[in-house]
C-alpha cells in the first residue's frame, strides 16, 4: 500500500529580524485607487451589453457595441508610486537570493533536516516553492541540479519520500510527475495507476488528514498537465476535484483551505504566474511549526514579497510610456471601441515579469490594444465599403494610402503602421535580422480574416463550422498578439525555431483554436445581439439540425479539453527539438488571452475580474 507524506507549510509570517533598518522606514500604505469605472466610492458602473442604437457620423448610419468606457486615466500613475525601487530593497533582495541558493546547495545527507527517508520530497518542495512564489528565475541552475537528482531515482512506480523509502508515496510521485514533466523530463503518467485501487479510486484514509489533503492537491495539480490519451490523468482530475471540493466544505478556514481554493481556481491554461505568486504569498508557510523549516520559508517569503514589490517600480516606468503612446497616438479620439491598454499590459506583466522583458510587455499591450480597436471597427463600426478599402490599403503598406480613407481609419492605419514598424526595428536588434515582411504578412492574414467576418455580417451568411473555425483561428488574434512581442525578447528565434512556434506550427494552431473556441462560448450571445450571428455555437447548430445551444456548448467544451491536452504535448514533448524555453512564451500568451475569457468576456466586461487582476497584480503592493 502506498503511503502519504506531506511537507509542512508554514505559520504566520513576519519580517525576518535581520531586515535592514532602512527598509523599516519605507513601509507601503493603503489607499483607494479611483478609476473611471467608479460612480461613487465602492460603486462600479456595470456595462450594457446590448447593441446601442445606430448613430450618425457624417451622415453614415453606424452601429456601436455598447461597451463601457475606459476604466483608467492618467492618474493611475501616481498610485504606482512605490519605495521599492530604492537601492536598500534591491541590496536586501540580492542577499536573500544568495541565502536561498545556499539552501539549495546545502541539501545533503549531512544536513540533519534531510535523510534518505525524506530527501526527495524536500528537494521537490523547495523547487515547487520558488516556482509558485515567482522567484525561480534566480535559481535555474539549482533547480536543474535538484531535478536531475530526483529524476535519477524515478521508477515505473514513482518515488518515495526519500531515496531509501521502501514504498512509493503519492505526494512525492504526484509533485514529481508535475514538476519533472514541466521541465521536459520523460515521465509517464502511468505511475499514478499504482496508487489506484480496483475501483479506480486513489488510496485515501477516512480521516482526511492534512497530509493526505496536500497529497491530493498535488495529484490535482499534476492531473492538469495531461497529454492526449492519458486516461489515468483524467481519472485523477475527476477524483481530486471531487475530493478537494468536498474537503473544503468540511475543514475550517485556514491557510490550507485557502490554498485548496486557490488551486481549484487556477486552471493550468488560464493560470497567470504573477497572479499565482501573489495568491501563494498569502498562504505560503502559514502552518509551519518546525523552527528550522520556518526560517527557510521566511527567507523564501521575504524574497518573494520584495521581488513582487520591486517589479512594480519598473511597471510604473513602463506604464507611463504606454499611456503616453496611447495618448500621442490619438486613441482618446477613438470613441467607438473598447480601450484595454492597461488591462493588456497587466496580462503581459503576469506572464513575463522578468525585468529584461520590457519590450515584450509593452509590445504585447500595444498589439492587443490595436487588435481590439480593429475588432470593433470590423465587427461593429465600419461600413463594408470602408472596410474593403482599408483592407486593400493595408496591403500597400504606404502612409500615402490613407488619403482615400475616412478620418477614423486614417488614424488606425497610421497607428498600425507605426507600431508594426517600431516592433520590427526592435526585433531586428534582438534577432539580428529584418522581420518586417514576415510580420506584415501575419497582420495582412489577420485583417483578411476580419474582412471575411465583416462580409458574413453584412450578407447574413452563416458558414459551416469548419469554414468558420478555420477563419476564426486566424481572427482570434493569437498569432499577431504573440509574434512581434516574442521577437523583441533576448531569446534567439532562428527561422527553424520560429516556424515551430509561429504559423503554421501545431503550437500556434492549437493556441489559436483554444482562444477562438473559448472566446465564442463567452461572447456568442452578446455578439448575436450586436448583429454578429456566426460563432462556433451557431455554426455547430447549423451543421447538426436539432442540436440545442446546450448541445453545442457541451461539444465545444469537450473539444477545448482535447485541444488543451494537445497544447500540453506541443509544449512539453520531451522528444521535441525545440527547447521548452522557446515555446513557453507563445504558450504563455495563450494562457494570458485565455484568462480574459475565464469567467466571462473579460474584454468587453472588464470592470469585474479583469479590473481585480489589475488592482491585485499592478496597483497594490504586497504588505510586509
Swiss-Prot record:
Residues engaged in binding Mg(2+) 2: 375, 379
Which residues make up the binding site for Mg(2+) 3?
527
Its annotated function is as follows: Terpene synthase (TPS) involved in the biosynthesis of monoterpene natural products included in conifer oleoresin secretions and volatile emissions; these compounds contribute to biotic and abiotic stress defense against herbivores and pathogens. Catalyzes the conversion of (2E)-geranyl diphosphate (GPP) to (-)-beta-phellandrene.
An annotated GO cellular component of this protein is: chloroplast
Residue range covered by the transit peptide? 1-48
Q: Which cofactor does it need?
A: Mg(2+); Mn(2+)
Which classification does the entry list for the species? Eukaryota, Viridiplantae, Streptophyta, Embryophyta, Tracheophyta
Instruction: From the UniProt record, give the pathway where this protein acts.
Output: Terpene metabolism; oleoresin biosynthesis
Chloroplast recorded as keyword? yes
- What protein name does the entry list? (-)-beta-phellandrene synthase 1, chloroplastic
One GO term of the biological process aspect: monoterpenoid biosynthetic process
The domain section of the record reads: The Asp-Asp-Xaa-Xaa-Asp/Glu (DDXXD/E) motif is important for the catalytic activity, presumably through binding to Mg(2+).
Write down the EC number: 4.2.3.52
Instruction: Give the Gene3D superfamilies listed for this entry.
Output: Farnesyl Diphosphate Synthase, Terpene synthase, N-terminal domain
Keywords, A to Z, come to:
Chloroplast, Lyase, Magnesium, Metal-binding, Plastid, Transit peptide
Q: Name one GO molecular function term.
A: lyase activity
Which gene name belongs to this protein? TPS-Phel-1
Q: Where in the cell is it found?
A: Plastid, Chloroplast
Which parts of the sequence bind Mg(2+) 1?
Answer: 375, 379
Q: Where is this motif: DDXXD motif?
A: 375-379
Question: Which PANTHER family did the record assign?
Answer: OS04G0344100 PROTEIN-RELATED
Please verify whether the record's keywords include Acetylation: no
Q: Give the catalytic activity.
A: (2E)-geranyl diphosphate = (-)-beta-phellandrene + diphosphate
Q: Which family does it belong to?
A: Belongs to the terpene synthase family. Tpsd subfamily.
Any single Pfam family the record assigns to this protein: Terpene_synth
Q: Which CDD domains match?
A: Terpene_cyclase_plant_C1 (cd00684)
